[in-house]
């Protein structure tokens, strides 16, 4: 089948920002001006096209990244709308993995906020070229130039200003295009669909000339011929200038910065032009690397329809009409509905049922997809987030995404008998959609425990169970996911024998437990030489230890940052078995760990509080009382920003305390930073609580 749009006219982009910077409204306007959305949906009245889950419309924040396709100047723009709330950074990470470029949206009043920094760092990790859109220029306190300074100070980026605002706050009238050196004024009567190029107002001429010079000086560095001509006093023409800006943006030398007000319908079209002119197509980004499953050889798959098929599943969503939808980015080759592909991570064949092109909440069925496409596939049985789908004859595994460990857990109990079965199914579905959400059952109490990235994260998942799956459940108080580790090296010898007539059990093990640096997790190695423990019994030792580390010796929390080395052992020709070695390893763990200096670890959160000066003393005092360690204070506009490291255990309900302390004027964000040792007095309290 022939492609409708050539690959160099594709743009796979994400819109990323802090909560409330106006990301969903911006996406809405893009869909409106590209002819994909006929009525402008406002987040203000809970009707945005991209926010299609009920809770999103109610809370006015975006939770799931809906993928949608729009067309602009004969280019096909696939947009992934990403959530800006810190509890959903996993969604952002997931969508950045499959994008070629991104638009960072900033609030012109607040500037670069904490979550913007987090997302920016994630985009750096995946080497995603990006541009910035300074939004909400019509708000009181809007300051475009301060925002540009913050992009330098906070993000360490090189901003390249492409257009300047004309006026600000209620006087915001339009922008000055520094490439064309014209002013752009929008018509308000047709919701900003049309605009005029006019001469730059006299009072802005000097500012425009200054920024035009900065633009030229930075951009021409990307092209030797343009640079030489510029040094001789010849300015590049519009096309050459755009080429230079594009080259530098894709090479991540600088980030183009534009401004506008999506809500007031100003500045969106120049931003779309910039997406097409400056952000990369699938052909401009490096080809994807993968491994051949059997040989683990490195292989490169270029972005072309002629290469073998490969795609990455980056999101699973449950749709009320068609069931489970798998969103996938096709990196190479083509695929047709009805064909078979290989899930190389699970080693299972999957049949591609129907394929859909999504537009926020309506869809178009397609029969064929090629390299560069982002599609939703119906009917995949075994595929979860992060899996690779590939050609059955030439399989490949693309690099997997890494997902953070959950830091908070709550117990959930179904309210009625009928809810028991439904809850199991609902939780399984939600866990398949979201890899940072885990479900476990507590072996002692028999309760179902759900784990996630924050209070809001779990609250929304419980809410979805109620709405989508009609499951009523009661939720316990949030619990902290503590861990245990050891502080010194200890070797334990253990003999397990059981003789009671008939065949007995015998296993002898010598295991060294040694501490590892923070964040290393648990490791097992066998140092057996000379067959003191036969090869076939070593998996038994590994299995026994693996099951034992889930329950530490201090208060029954999982053990981490520890290495267990099997150094010696003994066996009996008749009585030894894998099971005997499993039991011996478990007992060795129980005996050895208390002597290896066990310690309790707790999750430490990085907290940033933005508060008016008047409440600063109260906020700092309160953070100190929560065992917080103040990292520093900054001035942001007329507010103070306090950075601190605080144990998660002391942060429950903080939002209400902060609200009442500052009369609702202070805000905070927090995300997991690291695990740290619990002080002795607190450790004793936790032990007593667990024992009681």
Swiss-Prot record:
Pfam families: EF-G_D2, EFG_C, EFG_III, EFG_IV, GTP_EFTU
Main location: cytoplasm
Segments forming domain tr-type G: 8-283
Keywords of this entry: Cytoplasm, Elongation factor, GTP-binding, Nucleotide-binding, Protein biosynthesis
KW Ribosomal protein (keyword) present: no
Molecular functions (GO terms): GTP binding; GTPase activity; translation elongation factor activity
Localization annotation: Cytoplasm
GO cellular component terms listed in the entry, alphabetical order: cytoplasm
A GO BP entry: ribosome disassembly
InterPro entries, alphabetized: EF-G-like_DII, EFG_II, EFG_III, EFG_III/V, EFG_IV, EFG_V, EFG_V-like, G_TR_CS
SMART domains to which the protein is assigned, alphabetical: EFG_C (SM00838), EFG_IV (SM00889)
Keyword Protease: no
UniProt-annotated binding residues for GTP: 17-24, 81-85, 135-138
Family statement: Belongs to the TRAFAC class translation factor GTPase superfamily. Classic translation factor GTPase family. EF-G/EF-2 subfamily.
Function comment: Catalyzes the GTP-dependent ribosomal translocation step during translation elongation. During this step, the ribosome changes from the pre-translocational (PRE) to the post-translocational (POST) state as the newly formed A-site-bound peptidyl-tRNA and P-site-bound deacylated tRNA move to the P and E sites, respectively. Catalyzes the coordinated movement of the two tRNA molecules, the mRNA and conformational changes in the ribosome.
Matches recorded under HAMAP family: EF_G_EF_2_B (MF_00054_B)
Listed name of the protein: Elongation factor G
Organism: Rhodospirillum rubrum (strain ATCC 11170 / ATH 1.1.1 / DSM 467 / LMG 4362 / NCIMB 8255 / S1)
Biological classification of the source: Bacteria, Pseudomonadati, Pseudomonadota, Alphaproteobacteria, Rhodospirillales
Encoding gene per record: fusA
């Amino acid at each position: 089948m022939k492609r409708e749009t050539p690959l160099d006219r594709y743009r796979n982009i994400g819109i990323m920002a802090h909560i409330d910077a106006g990301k969903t409204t911006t996406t809405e306007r893009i869909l409106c001006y590209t002819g994909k959305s006929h009525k402008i949906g406002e987040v203000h009245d809970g009707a945005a096209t991209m926010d299609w889950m009920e809770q999103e419309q109610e809370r006015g924040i975006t939770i799931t990244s809906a993928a949608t396709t729009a067309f602009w100047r004969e280019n096909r723009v696939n947009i992934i709308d990403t959530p800006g709330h810190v509890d959903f950074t996993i969604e952002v990470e997931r969508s950045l993995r499959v994008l070629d470029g991104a638009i960072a949206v900033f609030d012109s009043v607040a500037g670069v906020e904490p979550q913007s920094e987090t997302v920016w760092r994630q985009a750096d990790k995946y080497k995603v070229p990006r541009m910035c859109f300074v939004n909400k220029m019509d708000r009181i306190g809007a300051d475009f130039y301060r925002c540009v300074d913050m992009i330098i100070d906070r993000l360490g980026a090189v901003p390249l200003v492409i257009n300047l605002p004309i006026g600000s706050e209620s006087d915001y009238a339009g922008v000055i295009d520094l490439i064309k050196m014209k002013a752009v004024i929008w018509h308000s009567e047709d919701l900003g669909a049309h605009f005029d190029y006019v001469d730059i107002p006299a009072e802005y001429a000097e500012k425009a000339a200054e920024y035009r010079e900065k633009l030229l000086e930075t951009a021409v560095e990307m092209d030797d011929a343009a640079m030489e001509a510029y040094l001789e006093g010849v300015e590049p023409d519009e096309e050459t200038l755009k080429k230079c800006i594009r080259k530098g943006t894709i090479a991540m030398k600088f980030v183009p910065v534009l401004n506008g007000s999506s809500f007031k319908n100003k500045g969106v079209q120049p931003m779309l032009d910039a997406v097409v002119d400056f952000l990369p197509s699938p052909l401009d980004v490096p080809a994807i690397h993968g491994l051949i499953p059997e040989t683990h050889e490195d292989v490169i798959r270029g972005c072309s329809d002629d290469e073998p098929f490969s795609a990455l599943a980056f999101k699973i969503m449950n749709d009320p009409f068609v069931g489970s939808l798998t969103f996938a980015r096709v990196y190479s080759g083509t695929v047709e509905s009805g064909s078979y592909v290989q899930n190389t991570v699970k080693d299972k064949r999957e049949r591609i049922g129907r394929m859909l092109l999504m537009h926020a909440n309506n869809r178009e069925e397609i029969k064929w997809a090629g390299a560069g496409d982002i599609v939703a596939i119906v009917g995949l049985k075994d595929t979860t987030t992060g899996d690779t789908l590939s050609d059955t004859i030439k399989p490949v595994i693309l690099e997997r995404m890494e997902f953070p460990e959950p830091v908070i857990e709550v117990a959930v109990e179904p309210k009625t008998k009928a809810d028991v079965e439904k809850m199991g199914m609902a939780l399984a579905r939600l866990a398949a959609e979201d890899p940072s959400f885990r479900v476990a059952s507590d072996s002692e109490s028999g309760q179902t425990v759900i784990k996630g990235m924050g209070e809001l994260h779990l609250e929304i998942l419980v809410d979805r169970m109620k709405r989508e799956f009609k499951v009523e459940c009661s939720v316990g108080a949030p619990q902290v996911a503590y861990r245990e580790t050891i502080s010194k090296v200890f070797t334990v010898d253990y003999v397990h024998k059981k003789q009671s007539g008939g065949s007995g059990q015998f296993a002898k093990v010598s295991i060294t437990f040694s501490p590892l640096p923070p964040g290393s997790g648990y490791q097992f190695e066998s140092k057996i030489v000379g067959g003191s423990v036969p090869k076939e019994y070593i998996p038994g030792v590994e299995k026994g230890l693996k099951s034992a580390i889930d329950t530490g010796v201090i208060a029954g929390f999982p053990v981490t940052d520890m290495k267990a080395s099997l150094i010696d052992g003994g066996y009996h020709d008749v009585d030894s078995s894998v099971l005997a070695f499993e039991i011996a390893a478990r007992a060795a763990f129980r005996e050895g760990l208390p002597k290896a200096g066990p310690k309790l670890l707790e999750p430490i959160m990085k907290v940033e509080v933005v508060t008016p000066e008047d409440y600063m003393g109260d906020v700092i005092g309160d953070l100190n009382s929560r065992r917080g360690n103040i990292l520093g204070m900054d001035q942001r506009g007329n507010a103070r920003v306090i950075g601190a490291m605080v144990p998660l255990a002391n942060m429950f309900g903080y939002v209400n305390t902060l609200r009442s302390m500052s009369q609702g004027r202070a805000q905070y964000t927090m995300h997991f930073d690291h695990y740290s040792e619990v002080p002795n007095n607190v450790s004793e309290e936790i032990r007593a609580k667990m024992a009681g």
